[in-house]
From Swiss-Prot:
Gene Ontology molecular function, alphabetical: phosphate:acyl-[acyl carrier protein] acyltransferase activity
Keywords, sorted A to Z: Cytoplasm, Lipid biosynthesis, Lipid metabolism, Phospholipid biosynthesis, Phospholipid metabolism, Transferase
Biological source species: Leuconostoc mesenteroides subsp. mesenteroides (strain ATCC 8293 / DSM 20343 / BCRC 11652 / CCM 1803 / JCM 6124 / NCDO 523 / NBRC 100496 / NCIMB 8023 / NCTC 12954 / NRRL B-1118 / 37Y)
Record Pfam families: FA_synthesis (PF02504)
Function in brief: Catalyzes the reversible formation of acyl-phosphate (acyl-PO(4)) from acyl-[acyl-carrier-protein] (acyl-ACP). This enzyme utilizes acyl-ACP as fatty acyl donor, but not acyl-CoA.
Pathways involved: Lipid metabolism; phospholipid metabolism
GO BP annotation list: fatty acid biosynthetic process; phospholipid biosynthetic process
Ranges in a coiled coil: none
Subcellular location: Cytoplasm
HAMAP family in alphabetical order: PlsX
Protein name: Phosphate acyltransferase
A GO CC term attached to the entry: cytoplasm
Catalytic activity entry: a fatty acyl-[ACP] + phosphate = an acyl phosphate + holo-[ACP]
Amino acid sequence: MKIAIDAMGGDYAPMEIVKGVEIARDRYPDIEFLLFGTSEQVKPLVKDWSHITLIPTTEVIEMGDEPVKAMRRKKDSSMVRAANAVKAGEADALFSAGNTGALLSSAIFLIGRIKGVDRPALATALPSFAGENDQFVFMDLGANAESKASHLYQYGILGSFYASHVLGINDARVRLLNNGAEEDKGDEVHKIAHQLMKNSQSFNFLGNVEARELLEGTADVVVADGFSGNAALKATEGTALMMLKQIKQAIMQTGLRGKMGGLLLKPAFKDIQKKLDYNEAGGAVILGVNAPVVKTHGSAKANAVANTMGQIKKMIEKNLVPDIRTYIADHKDELQAAKNEL
């Protein structure tokens, strides 16, 4: 098993990327790590070269670069070289903490879409604070600002596969993010998508879900268009972090009694903080392309990088991409019928 690593992508690259890879190497001795990066920056950081190979590159795609132009012009960048290694079969998966748009472009245009998937989407696992399971799949997080009803329908299929193969959730409960629970809510795209998903035999669709219910455990897969999904994700993350901050401030301002109570509650707050910590969860996955492609937060540190390697390992071992490819090929008539509903 080989993972191609964009060693130069991210706010703390290459130092935290290399540290994370070395942690992962010690955890997962069956993985070979291909580090793509600037030799003079990466080489001094590697303490032990076992199961690690450096492939020197001369360019870096910066966070502010225009994604498609950067992918096309910076052909010797760490990200593009890593993507091409996956395309050529020299690696099984691609990891980056760099420019999200450029990674999406590299995944779609270099590694390529699975035949039959119209729009690959960005998915992540978010915590559930109630219900049967600890996590749920949320997608699209912004790969596609606009979506057709058939795209949302396909996301239900992709998300269900990720839930079963990676999160271990069989017969995942799928819901559509909308501005109300009733069937007739939303714009025309969401109304059509609701009907397509309701009539589908490909997954277990339970109807709409509102953004306020995202963390309540009522779904194992929540499907959204990229604009709404990205906005809901950032609002949820921001609200959760602000609430924890406000609770901490309130405890510190209530005198000795409040501080004593806060000490008693500290383990509970740590558990909540851990569930909300992206360093624990791994990265966001580009579903619908021909290999696992995973993006961690730009500010991710070594532990987040290492945890993401475990996530990628599971995707490969569970045959996530081959199983999606087979299912899409076997159900092409059903997918075409969904497009014809537009």
